[in-house]
Each structure stands twice: as C-alpha cells, then as structure tokens.
C-alpha cells in the first residue's frame, strides 16, 4: 500500500503497511469520510510526527494517547497545537514543569515543531479522531501500528529517551529494550492528575542522559 510518510519511516515500516489490519484501518477512515464524518488532523498531517523527525534523528519519544478532538487543534504532533490555538491544559502544565525544571521562561507558544525538528518524536498512540469525540478512533488499528513504531525504534536505534506520562503511556514500557534505551515515567500532565506530574524533571533528566552519551541536548525553550 502506498502511504505518504517520510522516506526513512516508509522503509522501516513497509511491512506494517502491507498487513491486513492496516488495510482495514484505511478502509475505516475512507468510510468515515464518505459518511460525512469530520476527522482530525487533516489527512496531510496524520504522519506529521514522522515527517518532522526522521528515524535516524530520533533521540526522545514523547508518547500521547490520541489527537485533540476540537476544531483546528490536532496537527499530527502529540500534545502540540498550531500557532493560533490556545495551549490546552496538559500543554500548559508541561510548560510549567519546564520552567521549574530548567529555570527558563516559556512564551506559551503552543506549537512543538521546534522540538520535533531536534529529534523529539511526538507520537500519539492513535493518529486520528472524529470531531468532538475523544478516543473515537481507538481500537481501529492505530495502536497496532504505533506499537510497531515503538518496537522498531527500540530494536534499531540506540540511546533513545522515552517519556511515558500516565497509565496509558506507561503500559507501553514493555515494548522498549531498557538495556539500550532510557525510560522516564511520570503521571500525566493533565489537570485531572492533580499535579502529580510536577517535579518529574524529565526535561533536564533527558538532556543529562543525552549529554552523557554524546548526543546534542534538546533546547526545550519556546
């Protein structure tokens, strides 16, 4: 199956695109559109995380659950929204933690493309959603695909820092070879977690790890 995705990922994931579950997933999305359902993000942005962070550049993975389901919010990067959209509550809490952890001022600019271009794979486990219906595209095949992505990174890259926030993301830890990679776990940054995310210091810890293995730290300031 021909999938429009960055070439290094296309090569790495070619086997997934030929599996029955992926054909079923594509059929489901076509049927959603044919029946007039509004799907986020727009089709050209579904694989945006991969387009901005080629496989050989991955040094951090931040795993989200599914895209924002409000108009104009989702643009293919976990936790991120486009420039003209107010930062959602979880992203505001991420920025607060960065300010506390790194002693920098965050502008509140909500588009995380700068991170993606530095090797931070902003991966949602589910890559599409129906407008206004959270988790409406869970269990249609995306989880199988993104589990394969995590497994591929684990098996074929070295020294990647995985940030797993909340129980859903943490459930993916067994896909990761912790002899080769670094797994940082914390509560979810959502306000529903009652502040348990604060103090995790994942951003300084990730940079310390990257520096210690000779990789360029991430400039987290926006």
Predicted regions and their residues:
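A polyanion-binding, active-site-adjacent surface
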Residues: 15-164, 168-171, 176-185, 189-194, ...
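Generic N-terminal amphipathic, Lys/Arg-enriched alpha-helix
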Residues: 1-13
